[in-house]
Amino acid sequence: MNLIYNFSAGPAMIPRDVLNQAKKELHNWKNLGSSIMEISHRSEEFIQMALEAEKDLRDLLKIPDSFKVLFCQGGARGQFSAIPMNLLNNLQTADYINSGYWSNSAFMEAKKYCTPRSIFIRETNGVKESLLPMHKWNINENSAYIHYCPNETIDGLSIYEEPVFENKIIVGDFSSFILSRSINIKNYDLIYAGAQKNIGPAGITIIIIRKNIIGSSSKMTPSILDYKKISDHHSMFNTPPTFAWYLSGLVFKWLKKQGGLKAIEKLNKKKSDLLYKKIDNSDFYINKINSKHRSQMNVVFHLVNPKLNYIFLKEASKTGLNYLRGHSIVGGMRASLYNAMPLEGVESLVKFMSYFEKRYG
């Protein structure tokens, strides 16, 4: 079978080595005679796996003991509600840095629980879009927390500067950013991430939260979204998505074998640089994002002649380059280059783009 490269924004590719290991262990995990999908989440074997997964994640991100790691459900959208219910702490407002679709979605959900402020940071210089630097963010001193999204998958925008605001709780939606590069976890109080981009299959959500902000949830908070309840029950207040947890653990081990986040960050830059170079050196393709804020995870580009979009997608799919259609909000194309996307996949895409430009340009 020809190699298929999945450029979807999520669910995304999972490393081939991880899939092969999961396939090998599917019917008989740890010589138990059962699949991990079939055993109790309270069994000794599963708990050991869960502890290993957390340890590997802590090693990768250098998470100190002052943080809890929670494996939850509900995706990032679940956290859009959980965050205000857990962190407002009787205050009436929070600051939401608005850089695109997902940060705005979090803001809109927060309006159900408080009076949040949307701080719009996008600006256009000529034809290129960029983002205001953090020192120009108009932060409200009375806000309960600051929420931002370092990578907007739909818009192809990234904030690489890490937040430093004194006496403020910093919350980050890292769904498409986590494990793609090294970060200083101590600059944050809570980061959360849906798994289906850089971690594993859809169904599990990871929360990394500073211990001293757990325990201030409002009375209206459902137990399933209460960080203290989840923490006290070791992420097993209800039956967790066991297979997604297991696969995430395999991905963490795979990342460590690749050399950790420094090596992954270097490879991710190489992949995105290759694709952006192709776009920038062409009059056939265009990217409208300032180079300082271009996403390494989600490369958004347009054909100068949009009438060729359908043909581009159809011919790309025939060569094994799948799910390149851009989101309906922005149109065009989007190539998601998450950790599991090999360099060879990007090279194949660039080669196809050159062929397509030569034929139709």
Swiss-Prot record:
Keywords for the protein's UniProt record, in alphabetical order: Amino-acid biosynthesis, Aminotransferase, Cytoplasm, Pyridoxal phosphate, Pyridoxine biosynthesis, Serine biosynthesis, Transferase
Pathways per UniProt: Amino-acid biosynthesis; L-serine biosynthesis; L-serine from 3-phospho-D-glycerate: step 2/3; Cofactor biosynthesis; pyridoxine 5'-phosphate biosynthesis; pyridoxine 5'-phosphate from D-erythrose 4-phosphate: step 3/5
Residue spans crossing the bilayer: none
Binding residues annotated for L-glutamate, in chain numbering: 42
Protein name: Phosphoserine aminotransferase
Chain sites annotated for binding pyridoxal 5'-phosphate: 76-77, 102, 153, 173, 196, 238-239
EC supergroup of this enzyme: transferase
Modification N6-(pyridoxal phosphate)lysine occurs at: 197
Major localization listed first in the record, in broad terms: cytoplasm
Gene Ontology molecular-function annotations: O-phospho-L-serine:2-oxoglutarate aminotransferase activity; pyridoxal phosphate binding
Subcellular location: Cytoplasm
Catalytic activity annotation: O-phospho-L-serine + 2-oxoglutarate = 3-phosphooxypyruvate + L-glutamate; 4-(phosphooxy)-L-threonine + 2-oxoglutarate = (R)-3-hydroxy-2-oxo-4-phosphooxybutanoate + L-glutamate
GO terms for cellular component: cytoplasm
Cofactor note text: Binds 1 pyridoxal phosphate per subunit.
Complex and partners: Homodimer.
Cofactor(s) this protein cannot do without: pyridoxal 5'-phosphate
Keyword Amino-acid biosynthesis: yes
EC number: 2.6.1.52
Keyword Signal applies: no
Disulfide cysteine pairs (residue numbers): none
PROSITE patterns, per database record: AA_TRANSFER_CLASS_5
InterPro entries, per database record: Aminotrans_V_dom, Aminotrans_V_PyrdxlP_BS, Pser_aminoTfrase, PyrdxlP-dep_Trfase, PyrdxlP-dep_Trfase_major, PyrdxlP-dep_Trfase_small
Gene name linked to the record: serC
Family as reported in the entry's similarity comment: Belongs to the class-V pyridoxal-phosphate-dependent aminotransferase family. SerC subfamily.
A Pfam family recorded for this sequence: Aminotran_5
UniProt record, GO biological process: L-serine biosynthetic process; pyridoxine biosynthetic process
